[in-house]
C-alpha cells in the first residue's frame, strides 16, 4: 500500500475508517513493514478482503497492490534463442576440478589476462609534480567484446563458424582518471560474490532482504551484473564501489516487499552514509539535500508490467539525485508497458546483438528506451567458478554496461540530472538497419559509447559480419516468442 505524501500515514491512522477497523482488531498489529524515503510513504499490511475494499476508498491512500512475487529471468530460455558460441561443461570426474571449455582462465593476477597501459601525449600526459590532469587514455588489451564495442564507433568482426577467432584481438580504450572511485553503484539483485578477486576489494555488503541464512550470491545473476559494472577485467568502471543489495533468493525469486526494501536502503545509504559510513560525493559535511552533488547509481535488471507504486518509488529516488538505470525487458514488446522502464527520468537500456549490430530479437523497444548496449553472449564473472568467466544473454547484461558508464560520468563531475543527456550526446547513432525498426515505433537508433574513439587498424576499414544468409535463417527459425514467460503479477529479471 502506498500513501499520498509524507503526512498521509498519520492522517490515515487517525481517519474514521481506521477507527472503525480498530473496533474489530488493532490495525497496527497487522502492519508488517513500513517504507519511508523522501516523500514516498508505504507499508505492507495483512488485511481481509472486506477491509481492503474500504481502504482503497480512503483519500489518503494512493493505491493498494498485492505483495506479488517476482523471479529471475530464465537464462536458459534466452540462451536457447541466440546461443551459437562456446559451452561450459562442468565435469568434475573422480572428485577432480570442473573442466570448463572455451574460456581463458582468469586467475586475477593482472597482466596474465588483463593488460593495462596508458597512452598520452602533450596536454593529456599525466604530471608527476602533483598537478595531475583529468584525461589520458588507457588501453585494456585482449578486452572482452562488450568493452571493445563500447569504445568503438564501428562494428567488430565475428565469425559464427569460429566464435573464438577474434577473442584476443580487441582493445578497450578509456580515460585513466575518473574511473568511479567516488561513486557507489548499488546492485539490487540476487547478491554479489563480494570477495571475488576481480573486484579488487571494492565490493561491499549492503543489505540482505531475503534473510535466508545464505550470504552472498547463490544464484549467479547478481555477480555477473556487478562484474559488468565494475570488475577489473569485465567492468566498464574500474574503480567504482559495488554495493550488494540482495533482493532475490537462490532461485532468483523475491517479492515486491524485498524490492521496495532495497530501494529504501539505497535512499538512506546514499543520503546519509555513503561508503564506509561517510558521504562519497564530497566532504564529510556534505548535506543530503545537495541533490546535484550526489554520486550514486542503482542498477535494476528487473521489471514488471506497468505499476504505479514502483514508478512512484523510483521517481522519489531520482528527485533525491540518485541515478537509476533499468533494463528494458526481454519480451520483444513496447517497454512503455512495463515498470520501472516507463518512468520518464530513468535510463532505460535495451540490448543489441553486437555480432550483427542489430537490436536483439528478445529486447523490448519503443520511445521509453533511451539507449542500447551489448546484450548477447556477454562475458562476465561467475559465482560458481571464480576463476572462469561465463556468458549470459539479456537486457540484464546490457543494463550494467550503461550503469558502469554512468559511474564514469558521475565521477568526472557531471550532475545526476545531466547524465542521460550526456549519454545521448556520446552515443553512436544510426547503427541499426532502418528496416529492423519499422515495427518498433519510437525506438531510438542509438548505442552506448564511452567517448574514446580509437579504431583498431586491422578491422576499421572492413564491413562485418561476414556470414551466410543460411546461418541467419537457421537462427531466426529457432526463435519462439512463446518461450518468454509473461505474467501481470510478476517482476522478472531481464
Language-model features: locations:
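Short, surface-exposed ligand-recognition loops at beta-strand->loop->(often short) alpha-helix junctions
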Residues: 1-12
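Gly/Ser-rich catalytic serine loop of serine hydrolases
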Residues: 212-223, 329-333, 389-402
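Protease zymogen maturation seam
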Residues: 26-34, 38-40, 57-183, 438-484, ...
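Active-site-proximal beta-strand/loop segments in catalytic clefts of secreted hydrolases
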Residues: 3-4, 47, 66-69, 153, ...
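C-terminal subdomain of the subtilisin-like protease fold in secreted/lumenal serine endopeptidases
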Residues: 34, 240, 244, 264-302, ...
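Extracellular S/T/G-rich loop segment that most often corresponds to the catalytic His/Ser-adjacent loop
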Residues: 183-184, 189, 322, 337-414, ...
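Subtilisin-like serine protease catalytic core
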Residues: 142-143, 160, 170-205, 212-264, ...
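Helix N-cap motif at beta-to-alpha junctions
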Residues: 46-52
Amino acid at each position: 500500500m502506498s500513501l499520498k505524501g509524507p503526512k498521509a500515514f498519520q492522517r490515515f491512522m487517525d481517519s474514521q475508517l481506521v477507527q472503525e477497523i480498530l473496533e474489530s482488531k488493532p490495525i497496527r498489529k497487522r502492519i508488517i513493514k513500513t517504507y519511508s524515503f523522501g516523500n514516498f510513504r508505504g507499508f505492507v499490511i495483512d488485511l481481509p478482503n472486506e477491509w481492503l475494499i474500504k481502504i482503497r476508498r480512503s483519500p489518503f491512500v494512493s493505491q493498494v497492490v498485492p505483495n506479488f512475487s517476482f523471479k529471475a529471468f530464465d537464462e536458459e530460455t534466452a540462451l536457447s534463442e541466440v546461443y551459437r558460441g562456446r559451452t561450459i561443461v562442468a565435469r568434475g570426474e573422480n572428485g577432480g576440478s570442473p573442466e570448463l571449455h572455451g574460456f581463458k582462465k582468469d586467475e586475477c593476477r593482472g597482466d596474465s589476462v588483463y593488460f593495462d597501459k596508458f597512452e598520452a601525449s602533450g596536454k593529456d600526459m599525466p604530471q608527476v609534480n602533483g598537478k595531475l590532469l583529468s584525461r589520458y587514455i588507457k588501453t585494456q588489451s585482449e578486452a572482452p567484446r562488450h568493452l571493445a564495442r563500447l569504445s568503438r564507433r564501428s562494428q567488430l568482426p565475428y565469425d559464427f563458424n569460429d566464435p573464438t577467432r577474434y577473442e584476443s584481438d580487441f582493445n578497450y580504450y578509456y580515460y585513466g582518471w575518473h574511473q568511479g572511485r567516488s561513486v557507489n553503484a548499488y546492485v539490487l539483485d540476487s547478491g554479489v560474490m563480494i570477495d571475488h578477486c576481480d573486484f579488487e576489494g571494492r565490493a561491499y555488503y549492503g543489505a540482505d532482504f531475503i534473510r535466508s541464512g545464505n550470504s552472498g550470491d547463490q544464484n549467479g545473476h547478481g555477480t555477473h551484473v556487478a562484474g559488468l559494472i565494475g570488475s577489473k577485467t569485465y567492468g566498464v568502471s574500474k574503480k567504482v564501489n559495488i554495493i550488494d543489495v540482495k533482493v532475490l533468493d537462490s532461485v532468483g525469486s523475491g517479492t515486491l516487499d524485498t524490492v521496495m526494501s532495497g530501494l529504501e536502503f539505497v535512499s538512506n545509504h546514499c543520503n546519509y552514509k555513503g561508503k564506509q559510513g561517510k558521504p562519497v560525493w564530497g566532504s564529510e559535511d556534505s548535506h543530503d539535500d545537495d541533490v546535484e552533488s550526489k554520486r550514486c547509481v542503482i542498477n535494476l535488471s528487473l521489471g514488471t508490467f506497468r505499476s504505479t507504486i514502483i514508478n512512484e518509488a523510483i521517481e522519489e529516488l531520482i528527485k533525491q539525485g540518485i541515478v537509476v538505470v533499468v533494463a528494458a525487458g526481454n519480451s520483444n514488446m513496447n517497454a512503455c508497458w512495463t515498470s520501472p522502464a516507463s518512468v520518464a527520468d530513468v535510463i532505460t537500456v535495451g540490448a543489441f546483438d553486437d555480432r550483427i549490430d542489430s537490436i536483439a530479437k528478445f529486447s523490448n523497444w519503443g520511445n521509453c528506451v533511451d539507449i542500447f548496449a551489448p546484450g548477447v553472449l556477454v562475458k562476465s564473472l561467475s559465482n560458481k567458478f571464480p576463476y572462469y568467466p561465463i556468458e549470459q544473454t539479456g537486457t540484464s547484461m546490457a543494463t550494467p554496461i550503461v550503469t558502469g558508464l554512468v559511474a564514469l560520468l558521475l565521477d568526472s563531475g557531471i550532475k545526476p540530472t545531466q547524465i542521460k543527456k550526456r549519454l545521448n550526446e556520446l552515443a553512436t547513432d544510426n547503427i541499426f538497419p532502418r528496416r529492423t525498426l519499422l515495427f518498433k515505433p519510437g525506438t531510438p537508433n542509438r548505442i552506448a559509447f564511452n567517448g574514446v574513439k580509437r579504431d583498431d587498424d586491422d578491422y576499421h576499414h572492413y564491413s562485418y559480419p561476414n556470414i551466410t544468409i543460411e546461418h541467419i535463417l537457421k537462427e531466426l527459425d529457432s526463435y519462439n516468442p512463446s518461450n518468454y514467460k509473461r505474467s501481470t503479477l510478476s517482476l522478472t529479471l531481464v
